């Protein structure tokens, strides 16, 4: 009885933040750096944190026609960078942040899948998966979805935005429109209208990555009670996939931010 009551309490404590602020979990995104694309982890408005590079699972590069461009993956002790072997117009990536068990309210611990299976009968366990999409060009094929499990879809060309204009975005789960995702930009949540659209404002200096999250309850998973997807979207002109990129700097890019490099790897969702 005690374990059941404790489990219910922890479940409520774990779900409450998802209701009032479900975008608290970290995201990944790309940051162009002298020919390489650093894979950053954290909250874009706060800066990046160190992470275990083994959690980075895959990356795909695309040219202007959405054909695959080979990429080299460089893993450092607490980060990953990607080097395209040609001009790219888009990058996507997948990061499995693993299982987190909540043993007390507000305190989560990163555990292995086998440990999660042992703990799950008595404690709330979540599995956190991260995806990201970065555009460096725009075309008829690039504006179509890339097939990410959770994906932010821009409904107009972000490179044509002017200061004060809004970028309409939708969030897709398994290719289908979500009506109730959490969309966040610079730490602020944005309202989703009846068509599943959020309007993200352009600000002088460009965009931070836009974030979205969606959480599912799991009934038959021995290791986790819920599956949490986090995804991000960014756009900037770093590669030169089309001649128009030579006309000037992009109106849409990542804002400069101070990276918070941790002294050690953190157990962060």
Language-model features: locations:
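Short amphipathic beta-strand segments in non-cytosolic proteins
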Residues: 58-68, 181-191
């Amino acid at each position: 009885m005690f374990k059941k009551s404790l489990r219910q309490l922890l479940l409520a404590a774990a779900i409450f933040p998802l209701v009032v602020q479900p975008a608290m979990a970290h995201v990944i995104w790309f940051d162009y750096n002298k020919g390489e694309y650093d894979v950053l982890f954290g909250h874009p408005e706060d800066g990046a944190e160190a992470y275990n590079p083994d959690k980075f699972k895959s990356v795909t590069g695309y040219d202007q026609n959405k054909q695959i461009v080979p990429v080299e993956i460089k893993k450092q002790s607490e980060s990953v960078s990607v080097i395209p072997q040609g001009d790219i117009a888009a990058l996507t990536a997948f990061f499995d942040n693993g299982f987190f068990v909540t043993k007390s309210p507000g305190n989560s611990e990163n555990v292995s899948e086998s440990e999660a299976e042992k703990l799950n009968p008595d404690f709330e366990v979540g599995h956190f998966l991260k995806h990201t999409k970065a555009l460096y060009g725009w075309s008829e094929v690039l504006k179509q979805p890339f097939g990410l499990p959770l994906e932010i879809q821009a409904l107009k060309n972000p490179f044509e935005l002017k200061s004060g204009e809004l970028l309409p975005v939708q969030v897709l789960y398994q290719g289908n429109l979500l009506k109730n995702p959490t969309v966040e930009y610079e730490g602020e949540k944005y309202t989703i209208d009846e068509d599943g659209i959020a309007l993200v404002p352009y600000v002088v200096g460009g965009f931070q990555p836009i974030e979205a999250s969606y959480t599912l309850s799991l009934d038959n998973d021995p290791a986790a009670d819920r599956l949490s997807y986090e995804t991000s979207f960014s756009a900037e002109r770093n590669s030169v996939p089309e001649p128009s990129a030579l006309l000037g700097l992009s109106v849409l890019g990542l804002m400069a931010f101070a990276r918070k490099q941790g002294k050690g790897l953190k157990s962060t969702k």
